Regions:
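A residue-level marker of the well-folded mature domains of exported/periplasmic proteins
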Residues: 23-382
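C-terminal motif of bacterial Sec signal peptides marking the signal peptidase cleavage site
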Residues: 17-20
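Bacterial N-terminal signal peptides that target proteins for export
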Residues: 1-9
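Repetitive helical segments and hydrophobic/amphipathic motifs
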Residues: 12-13
């Protein structure tokens, strides 16, 4: 799951950028000031360019979560050209206020609307009920409807590959983890990373600092510097900016990028980045809506689907043994021969949680609320 907290906005009344692309057009408009009462549905696919909309919690920038989604939107434009008109709405806060945006996009004839943050869920459920001829897709959610599907990526697989590298590289045996908010997705990532790092080096300790936000460069810097002060010589993150990488570069230690390739923000510090590729899913979904074959089947892609991978591995900083180990683990996960959450797995207290030979199923992974052995830190109360 993803994006459960509200990114602070200057004002809910502030203008939100909307850019429409396709047919060589590029226009902007403001998000609606109030929820639309219109019940119009999008025109059937095939009658002129199909309207496809993306709702972003932030702006794409040049790295991170929204940037990764934007690359998927660009891939749709490149694939379909003047067969689609792609609209983006940026900086849309989570919660009830986002409903205005989804209703506006649906009433203006978009046939397919992607909501790329967890906190849009209830707004999308309500809007989908009133626009049955529009297809809605919600990233990281779990509520569906006949015209509302959900999709996500197994980021924990990318975190696990990073852990393989981290276990090889650390000299202090302390790895710092800058974490966003304590939801199953993030806990899963921390655990998968730690399992891999300690498989390589059982002495590794993974120290976690929470910032309780997806994007807060100031807090991200404070957390990263605090972890360096605690002896971390490798940093991992589950936050959206590249500040953690920049801190690593300044402190002359190493770090991993998250959601996209962050190597340019710390060329010497960068070990690798766990990067998401949404393009295949977005292209496939657009095609299904165009062809009338779309179904609201939940999708959780990963390494097998080439939707998450460890990219831009720094050959100068990552030893050959680590690179070979990552390649082998990648292939094992891809081929279904390995799952990071296969027992025996012990919790922080040393007690067995997953017995030998058992693999946690997806429902169990979605509800994970505990740290594995080797993690130092606690789960904040919600």
């Amino acid at each position: 799951m993803r994006r459960k907290v509200l990114i602070t906005m200057a004002s809910l009344a502030a203008a939100m950028l909307v850019s429409a692309c396709g047919k060589q057009e590029n226009t902007t408009a403001n998000a609606p000031a109030a929820a639309s009462d219109a019940q119009a549905s999008a025109a059937p696919a095939g009658k002129g360019p199909m309207g496809v909309a993306f709702v972003y919690i932030g702006n794409p920038g040049d790295a991170g979560w929204t940037y990764a989604h934007e690359q998927g939107a660009k891939a749709v434009e490149a694939k379909y050209g003047d067969k689609v008109t792609v609209t983006r709405v940026e900086n849309v806060p989570e919660g009830a206020d986002s409903e205005r945006v989804f209703r506006d996009l649906a009433s203006k004839g978009n046939k397919l609307v992607f909501g790329t943050s967890f906190g849009y869920m209830d707004s999308m459920v309500k809007t989908a009920a009133d626009f049955p001829d529009v297809t809605f897709e919600h990233a990281t959610g779990f509520k569906s409807a006949p015209n509302l599907g959900t999709y996500d990526v197994r980021t924990y697989e990318g975190a696990h590959l990073a852990g393989v590298v981290g276990g090889h590289v650390t000299k202090s045996n302390v790895i710092g983890y800058v974490a966003s908010v304590p939801i199953p997705e993030v806990i899963r990532n921390i655990d998968a990373f730690t399992i891999a790092a300690r498989e390589v080096n059982p002495k590794v300790k993974v120290k976690v600092v929470w910032i309780n936000s997806w994007f807060d460069p100031g807090k991200e810097r404070q957390a990263a510097e605090s972890l360096v002060g605690q002896g971390a010589d490798v940093l991992m993150q589950n936050v959206d900016s590249a500040v953690v990488m920049q801190v690593a570069e300044e402190k002359k230690i190493h770090a991993f990028g998250w959601d996209s390739d962050m190597s340019k923000f710390g060329p010497n510090a960068h070990l690798a980045s766990a990067a998401i590729d949404w393009s295949k899913y977005y292209i496939r979904t657009v095609d299904e809506v165009m062809q009338g074959t779309w179904k609201n089947t939940p999708v959780w892609g990963g390494i097998k689907e080439d939707e998450i991978n460890l990219v831009a591995i720094n050959d100068k900083a990552v030893p050959e043994a680590a690179r070979k180990a990552v390649a082998a683990r990648h292939d094992a996960i891809r081929d279904g021969k390995y799952d990071p959450f296969t027992g025996p797995i012990k919790g922080q207290d040393g007690k067995e949680i997953v017995p030998a030979g058992k693999t946690m199923n997806d429902d169990e992974k979605h509800q994970i609320n505990w740290f594995v052995e080797g993690v130092e830190g606690s789960l904040p109360k919600q």
